[in-house]
């Protein structure tokens, strides 16, 4: 018997997803299609009768706007929202802004897959001469981060290492209080939570593709452990196509 329910949603397609570019900590907004994805995700939650007590998101507008769109659809815009850099997307370092297919053609699909999907291999760091270095590293939303906390690049392992303390210290206590929690975040910060919840191996998390804009539902026991695998709110065809699209992102164009 489930003691709690948790809903995760990956932000809708961003303008840089649309251009197939590595976004990372660059603050790309939703594309028009991404806004529609978020709207459909919200409508799926509304149709299923979901209500929430508290929401968590990153400090990046594609996740925040997805959350706003969902809350609008379910008519719960008044809910408290906690924003944290710890739920940000993985920092793609020197790859930030590069087209994924062009990068695959240059470095090989295998190398790009390692950078995108490996557990502990970071991409090349973002150097001070990178075109988006000041845009990210000097942004005042990160002014309170220590030098150790502000990354120049991250592996998935690094992303999980900064997301999990927030999960354990801030989100889990809310779940255990019986609060109905909604998390709107990013592919890699959410994969970190999923890996932790399901006890997935490093190899399994490498192959996990989370679709954009589709609510992911977990039923949890009293210890905040899943009693069954994640469920997607949406028709099977929509979910399958979305997951395939995510998997195809790092492949060179034929």
Curated annotation (Swiss-Prot):
- This chain belongs to the protein called Phosphoglycerate mutase 1
User: What Pfam families does UniProt report for this protein, alphabetically?
Assistant: His_Phos_1
> Which residue numbers mark the site Transition state stabilizer?
186
Question: Which cysteines share a disulfide bond?
Answer: none
PTM: Acetylated at Lys-253, Lys-253 and Lys-254 under high glucose condition. Acetylation increases catalytic activity. Under glucose restriction SIRT1 levels dramatically increase and it deacetylates the enzyme.
Subunit structure of this chain's protein:
Homodimer.
Tell me the residues on which Phosphoserine occurs: 14, 23, 31, 118
**Functional note:** Catalyzes the interconversion of 2-phosphoglycerate and 3-phosphoglyceratea crucial step in glycolysis, by using 2,3-bisphosphoglycerate. Also catalyzes the interconversion of (2R)-2,3-bisphosphoglycerate and (2R)-3-phospho-glyceroyl phosphate.
**Where are the N6-acetyllysine residues found in this chain?**
106, 251, 253-254
| Residue sites binding substrate per the record | 10-17, 23-24, 62, 89-92, 100, 116-117, 187-188
Matches recorded under SUPFAM superfamilies: Phosphoglycerate mutase-like
Similarity field: Belongs to the phosphoglycerate mutase family. BPG-dependent PGAM subfamily.
* Biological process annotations from GO: glycolytic process
The record's CDD domains line, in alphabetical order, gives: HP_PGM_like (cd07067)
Taxonomy, superkingdom: Eukaryota
Q: Where's the active site on this chain?
A: 11 (tele-phosphohistidine intermediate), 89 (proton donor/acceptor)
Q: Which NCBIfam families match?
A: pgm_1, PRK14115.1
